[in-house]
Amino acid sequence: MARTEDDSWEITESVGATALGVASARAAETRSQHPLISDPFAQVFLDAVGDGVWNWHSAPQLPAELLEIEPDLPLQMEAMVSYMASRTAFFDEFFLDATRAGIGQAVILAAGLDSRAWRLPWPAGTTVFELDQPRVLEFKAATLAEHGAEPACGRVAVAVDLRQDWPTALRQAGFDPSVPSVWSAEGLMPYLPAVAQDLLFERVQGLTVRASRIAVEALGPKFLDPQVRANRSARMERIRAVMAHVEPQREIPRTDELWYFEEREDVGDWFRRHDWDVTVTPSGELMAGYGRAAAAQVEDRVPTNLFVAAQRK
């Protein structure tokens, strides 16, 4: 389903369904023998919505017809779980480092099914603001409440579309822009047009003071590469054709239709220009650092995103 200017979605639709895919990877990592992260709530979300393509990571075996045309698919899925686990660990550590250093306000942009407000050991007095579409936040809170889960911090849900005036909504929810804060933008950039990305950062700039921090999963150098896009599209069309025959109930989202393939300013450069200290870690380096490097056969199928960490001077 192609994007429109004011589109919205249920958790099983469009951008919402991609959050279930991330939850599936986190659940798979949590079940693994030596998990890098622990997200006990990821499987709770999957159980709440029932069967779908997002459950592939928990399937005992992929369809034989699928493995016949994509023999490396299990390795690719394993690599994506490792990518998501590394990404999750990066943001977990970023938030905990900042809050343990005395920052008392955390803001999660496009929170999706992120359960950090429930699962991380936040310092006493920390307030976590979660921003996302109303139906996504409602589903998350209701599902976790049904399972008796309680936030481990002062969680504040800010139900707002990031294309709207979310800074006003954030301030009205109790956010104090006069004291340091820590922010995340994880899994968000491809869903924003270039102009919206700039506006997002400008708004963060207007809500932060010295010593504030932000971590961003930025688009990597191959995001716009036409050959990379063509290869991914062809591979996914082969998979869709098989799945339409053997498991038609598992519709595979056309992710490329949800993303904005536009030239945009490098995220690290943007924050440097606006007086932030910046470090950038390529995804391959991040994964290797966690001992989760992708297998050579499929390393070209793992996102080449950049993990940006910045602190305002």
UniProtKB/Swiss-Prot annotation:
Domain of life: Bacteria
InterPro entries, per database record: Ppm1/Ppm2/Tcmp, SAM-dependent_MTases_sf, SAM_mthyl_Trfase_ML2640-like
Gene Ontology biological process: methylation
Pfam families: LCM
Entry EC number(s): 2.1.1.-
Residues that, per the record, bind S-adenosyl-L-methionine: 132, 161-162
Entry keywords, A to Z: Methyltransferase, S-adenosyl-L-methionine, Transferase
GO molecular function, one term: methyltransferase activity
Top EC category: transferase
Role played: Exhibits S-adenosyl-L-methionine-dependent methyltransferase activity.
NCBIfam families referenced in this protein's UniProt entry, alphabetically: mthyl_TIGR00027
Family of this protein: Belongs to the UPF0677 family.
Descriptive protein name: Putative S-adenosyl-L-methionine-dependent methyltransferase MMAR_0955
Native source organism of the sequence: Mycobacterium marinum (strain ATCC BAA-535 / M)
